[in-house]
Regions:
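Sec-dependent N-terminal signal peptides
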Residues: 3-16
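Basic side chains
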Residues: 2-3, 230
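Carbohydrate-active catalytic/glycan-binding domains of CAZyme proteins
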Residues: 20-230
Length: 230
């Protein structure tokens, strides 16, 4: 009986590793802060893929990078990952002018992505975690999980954005369709979002401060950064 049980365990483990591997991305690719999500493949309805979103650590002298990319794999084969390309860069104003004379894009940190339904259609929102002054609360929208994502909360000046998000934002759609946002550095914040903007507080609600104790506060937790509802 013990031998039979051991054989079952071995076969189970072998079956798992037959469909997965580590490292799962090429050694030249660097995506820390990864958030994996399972979304329906827009090109193969009824099939699902795992999409990896994260900061793109390709700057030699700074954290993260000036673009965000996504890799994906079929849920049935986690050994074959596909590069789906650059999904977002922040380098131009709303009317297409470069932010800076040297046309360098903004550095983007750990992002988050959410899927929701709008008018019967799947929509994806990206919090790219842009920390450049005036664009910290940036949010972008796409009708595909692999982008491209377009900024959807420009101010009237066309170069800054509006909203409540701060450092390391996360966004979450509950089963009842209500949307929530989370962010913070040393202290944690959260709020129910207005579904018409996806970046402002829902009317009649307030920002919740210190959702859990921060790293400089007394309490069971020591929140520092990287809000996530995962």
């Amino acid at each position: 009986m013990r031998k039979l049980f051991g054989l079952i365990i071995v076969l189970t483990v072998c079956g798992f590793y037959a469909n997965a591997q580590n490292p799962f991305l090429p050694l030249w690719e660097h995506i820390p802060d990864g958030e994996p999500y399972v979304f329906e493949d827009p090109d193969k309805p009824g099939s699902f893929r795992v999409y990896i979103y994260g900061s793109h650590d390709n700057l030699r002298t700074h954290y993260c990078g000036r673009d965000q990319v996504v890799w994906s794999a079929s849920v049935d084969n986690l050994r074959e990952w596909r590069y789906d390309g650059v999904i977002f860069k922040s380098e131009f104003t709303q009317d297409g002018r470069p932010f800076t004379p040297d046309t360098l894009a903004d550095v983007l940190y750990a992002p988050d992505v959410m899927e929701c339904i709008e008018n019967g259609r799947k929509v994806y929102y990206l919090c790219p975690n842009n920390q450049v002054g005036g664009r910290q609360n940036m949010i972008a929208k796409s009708y595909r999980p692999d982008g491209p994502f377009e900024v959807c909360n420009w101010n009237d000046d066309g170069r800054t954005t509006y909203g409540i998000f701060g450092f390391d934002p996360a966004i979450f759609c509950d089963d009842d369709g209500r949307i929530y946002g989370y962010w913070g550095f040393n202290r944690s914040f959260g709020a129910e979002l207005d579904p018409t903007t996806m970046c402002t507080v829902k009317p009649g609600t307030d920002i919740v401060e210190d959702m859990i104790s921060g790293c400089k506060q007394e309490g069971e937790f020591r929140f520092f950064e990287a809000s996530s509802m995962r």
